[in-house]
Every structure is written in structure tokens, then in C-alpha cells.
Regions:
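Phosphate/dinucleotide-binding and metal-coordinating scaffold of catalytic cores
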Residues: 1-219
């Protein structure tokens, strides 16, 4: 069984607060999730309902049979573009390491995302007093000045998808951290400016038959 400590980092909190503990187990290809609220969280914020599939009371709660991860973690998960990047990275690593490709679960996607650019207000730790997962300086968000390189990488990945082949690892490595946390199907990545302000950069797609970005700018 795998576990994560879940912290809320809402803008109205003075500091991140422990919400509870998320557990994950896969038995014979079937995923099961459990969650237990922190007593301190329930004491201070018991009137705040975070998810319609979790009740605000102490003790372990589980997802219904056949249901995926609890609803309020869904916003923190990558969508089609992010999952494509993470899946292709796993396929390339499996090929390089001469092993079968692992089946990735929502738990794997959750822990595969960079902390700074993760969508939503939840952050995760593997140990209560440890660092937030994927908060290392190595997993940096690229600057705006890298935008042309990121566009080239996204184009190469889309091209490989069209041709039903694996992309080169260098393209995946360039986009998997800044791009895997974002929702939607279009190629995109997180970037920061010189003031460390986070932006979402949407890229042209090989499938576009008009300038989608131009029209989104004015819509």
C-alpha cells in the first residue's frame, strides 16, 4: 500500500495545513483508494466540504468499487496532454530498462507532477516531516525565453503521436515537468518570467487548420 500526506495551501491559510492521509492499493489490476481526515483539520474546518464522495468525520473512508480516485483530487490530475507526456516517458524508460511498461494509475499521475505548477491548492508529502514531492530545484519550470524550444518539443511529440512511434526522450524530458500538470488536450507548458510569475503557454498544434491561439487571445 502506498500513502501520501495531503496538505491544503489555500490562499486564505496562513500556512499549509495537513488535511489527511491518502492511501492507494492495486489488487489484481483493480485500484482502491482510502482517505482519513486529520483530526486537527476536522476540528478547525469541519464545516468545509471538499468532496461529495468524502464525509467530514474521522476514520478511514474508501472509494466505491470501480470508482477512481476521490473527486477533490481530480483537479490535481493531468488531462490528455499531460497524461500523454507521462505515458510516453514510462514507455521510453521501460524500453531503455528492458522491462514491461507499467500500467499507470491516477496515483502515479498525481505523484508525477511538479509541485510548483500543480493545478489546485493541494500539495503532497510521502513523509509527514519531509519535503513536498517533486519540489526539487532540478524539476524547474522553464523561463519564457525557452518558449521556441518548448514549441519545437511539443511539435515533435505530436508528430510522433501521428506516426504511432515513441518520441525521443529529449523532447519528453523538456516538457514532462512543465507540461504534465496542465489540463486539456492541446500542447502546452508552464513557464515563468523574470519575476518568477507563472504562466501557461499554449502552443500551436499540428492538427490546427486556423490560428487557435490568436482567436483564444481575443475570446
Amino acid at each position: 500500500m502506498k500513502k501520501l500526506y495531503v496538505f491544503a495551501d489555500f490562499d486564505w491559510l496562513k500556512e499549509p495545513r495537513l488535511v489527511g492521509e491518502l492511501s492507494y492499493e492495486s489488487l489484481r489490476g483493480s485500484d482502491s483508494y482510502g482517505f482519513c481526515y486529520s483530526n486537527e483539520w476536522l476540528k478547525d474546518y469541519g464545516s468545509l466540504f471538499l468532496s461529495d464522495d468524502l464525509n467530514n468525520y474521522p476514520g478511514q473512508q474508501y472509494t466505491a468499487p470501480g470508482k477512481d480516485i476521490f473527486g477533490y483530487f481530480s483537479d490535481a490530475l493531468p488531462d490528455r496532454w499531460g497524461r500523454t507526456l507521462i505515458n510516453r516517458r514510462e514507455q521510453i524508460l521501460a524500453k531503455e530498462e528492458k522491462r514491461p511498461v507499467r500500467r499507470l494509475s491516477s496515483f502515479d499521475y498525481l505523484i508525477g507532477i511538479e509541485d510548483f505548477s500543480r493545478i489546485g491548492a493541494f500539495r503532497f508529502k510521502e513523509s509527514i516531516n519531509g519535503d513536498y514531492i517533486n519540489a526539487s530545484e532540478i524539476l524547474r519550470i522553464p523561463p519564457l525565453t525557452d518558449i521556441r524550444e518548448l514549441i519545437a518539443a511539443s511539435s515533435e511529440i505530436e508528430k510522433s503521436e501521428d506516426e504511432n512511434r515513441l518520441p525521443e526522450m529529449r523532447w519528453i524530458a523538456q516538457l514532462v515537468q512543465p507540461g504534465s500538470s496542465l489540463g486539456g488536450a492541446r500542447p502546452k507548458a508552464s513557464v515563468i518570467d523574470e519575476n518568477k510569475i507563472l504562466y501557461i503557454a499554449k502552443f500551436p498544434s499540428r492538427k490546427d487548420d486556423y490560428d487557435v491561439g490568436f482567436w483564444e487571445h481575443f475570446s
